[in-house]
Amino acid sequence: MSEEEVHDTSSEASEVFTNQPNAFVRGVRSIFGYRKTSLTLFVILTIVVTAGLSFYDNSLELTIELPTSQLEKEILESSWLDLQNIARYPHTYGSRANDQVHDYLEEIIQDMEYDNDGEKIMFESGKGVVSYYESNNLLVRVNGSDGTLPALLLSAHYDSVPSSFGVTDDGMGVASLLGVLRFVAHNQPRRTIIFNFNNNEEFGLFGAHAFVKHPWFKQVGYFLNLEGTGAGGKAVLFRGTDYGIVKNFGGVRYPYATSIFQQGFNNHVIHSETDYKVYKEAGLRGLDLAFYKPRDKYHTGEDNIRNVSPKSLWHMMSNAIDFVQMGVVDDSEEPAVYTTFLGYFFATPISALARVNLVLLVLFPVVSTPLLFVIVKYKKWKLRVTNFLGVPLAMGLAVAVGQVGNPMLVSSHPMMVVATTTSIVVLVYYVVLNGVDWVNTSSDQKLVTMIEVSFVYWVVLVYVTWSGGDHTGEFGVTVLFFVQASTSLLGLIGWTFTRVRGGDEPLLSGEEERYGTEDERDTEKPLVEHNYDWSLQYLLIVPVSSLVVYNSGWLVLEGVNKTVQESLASEHLIYWIVVVFSQFLVLPVVPFITKFNRYIVLGLSVVAVVGVLMSMAVHPFNQGSPMKLRFIERVGQNDMVEVYGRQGFVEDVLSDLPSVKQTQAKLECEALPDGLEVCKYKSGLTPGNLTVEVTTEPRAESYGLISGAITIAAPENRMCTVHFPPDRVKAVVVGKFGNNFKAIPDGFSREKGNYIYKDRNGISQLELYKLDWNKDYHVGFEWLPDIDDEGGMRVEVECFWGDMVPAYQEVVHYSPNWVTWANKERGLVGVVKHVDV
């Protein structure tokens, strides 16, 4: 070799050596280059950060601090003691313990300005249902420094259901009111505050209805209702009447809110109601602050002091203390969209969000369509129909995997169900999109997929915007569409700067390398084609979208997953939520899914297989997440215990009861509509000293109608119901019986101490609630006789008691630890009598 040749070779080697990138550059390329290993790292980090932030945001222990000031410490200690005393026993309206709670509260407030509300009300509480109620609310008024401001009502109910100690529902609300009362006793508020410790919320919101008739109601402009539909945890802002009042919640120290639950009420996904409904319908503006999970302990004996903590109580109480110090309320009365994250509160009128949505819906198609035209026509981006088949095909197949195995499993293992479903959805997308990628010649299938996902979000956003004010919980769709569409738009803009093949590559190249197995082919392309734009696209789309979807979806699922026990319709709804949740969790990573490496695919396959197998093998209920059964014992012609629950579970529980085995009682199980069943049996454990006597009074005929009356004697009783044949009874009266029904006006009226209600469409049921334990009920009514009878009418009377039920004590004591019990009716036992009038 000549000296010149040696010199040239040395020069070339030196040039190659000097052109080698340094360690930093190689590190950046290995992390941000579009390689399977890089994507795996990004995905793992996204999962860890998303789950970690969501866990922190929803954690009571990590986000709420106990008070440090001496006054607030004393208030919390006193209120916690109040809660322990209030929830010592179940204290339903029909129990003596209810009177004890009333007297306990009255003793605390006796030195303040208060009124032992004795309103008697009568109103139509449902279609064909009329209710008569005697109230014993406790009202307290603390006058503010500015008498020109409308008063603020704070409300909580001190009754429980007969099957629960009522700690969360609503002992913590009552204890929080007492805490606020002690606070304002030391710090005069600016506006007058009226406290309504109301009774009998559980069976018809009666305490709230009674307050609306009280003279103090006229002072009130705003309200804060404190409730509980779970058992401890964090108190969430369930709903607000309007933006003007909702935005004041941003001033509390520990805001925790989402308008998703508000939409759940508006769309009737959440069926239970609170006093909020009464106050809103009466024209007040306010908020509903409540504990919301877990619902399988709601209204059961598990709603007890052991399952809550002072920190839960302090969360509700401290926010109430802060809220009562609000200043002037904005006049805006349109629905509000609101949420919190990491303690930061955000609220906006629904109209403002709608305007943003309209701009986004119009702007992105208008901008992206010309760009797409230019790219395809002048930049030679080759697209085929097959490019656009992947996402819709995979989405359709993924919907089919909504329910895996045991349908009840979501009640106790929601994370397992979501993880299994999501893993299967990811695998479906992975297989389908890799197939599409294999047959396509497109040089940027990733951007095509981004555009398709953007279109999916666009369609959803159109629906959300068109639906209007009832859809205040779908604000996350705006965020999802914005980040996805913006990133797609950036990709299209990058393509417009791409030179036709043979030219120089742009800074944001649309070119995407083809790859083989694992990472070896990721390094085969020249350095100019490392494609770092994918990391920017990933960071713009996936972290924000994943956090929005995961945090919102998990909040919804934790709030409603227990309702799968309530009906087949609820089961279908829950699994629809799971499928939608999984789809939206996966959509942000769909553009990058073909780059998943073998370890992610293997891990997802293991999760899917193990999840499916466990869903078939694991019992759906356990001590921590029990099944709820509902109990009522009816005493009358056929003394029977009735237990209601989902089909397939009730008989096994009851067959092991001692009274059933010893008496060889026959279990009679009957399938009910919507996936429920009722099992009945005769119990030897009959309650004692429960008597109902019904006597009739003379009747009279007038203008074709017949008037009659009955007297109901039910010692130690507060609650009875009179059932009439459908559509025949046109008027009812509680009090003295009279014959002048023709002169009675439609609706409610009061005459000489009698409470009268007339409805020409017919009254099928009259509910009676009284305070005097031993006073008889006197009920008159007017009815229209059938053509084929002699004018008589059979009336059924059922009176309820909330205690003294040995059969209920037996089922609680001997049932498995994965079962909890709740009341089916207003009491645990009902005594039934029939009388011909």
Curated annotation (Swiss-Prot):
GO terms for molecular function: metal ion binding; metalloexopeptidase activity. The keyword DNA-binding does not apply. Residues 58-355, 406-415, 468-474, 561-572, 620-837 are vacuolar. Keywords: Glycoprotein, Hydrolase, Membrane, Metal-binding, Metalloprotease, Protease, Transmembrane, Transmembrane helix, Vacuole, Zinc. InterPro entries: Fxna-like_M28_dom, M28_fam, Peptidase_M28, PFF1_C, PFF1_TM. It is a multi-pass membrane protein. Zn(2+) 1 binds at H157, D169, E227. GO terms for biological process: proteolysis. Glycans are attached at N143, N561, N689. The chain crosses the membrane at residues 37-57, 356-376, 385-405, 416-436, 447-467, 475-495, 540-560, 573-593, 599-619. PANTHER family: METALLOPEPTIDASE M28 FAMILY MEMBER (PTHR12147), VACUOLAR MEMBRANE PROTEASE (PTHR12147:SF58). Residues 1-36, 377-384, 437-446, 496-539, 594-598 are cytoplasmic. This is Vacuolar membrane protease. The record marks Y298 as: Transition state stabilizer. Its EC number is 3.4.-.-.
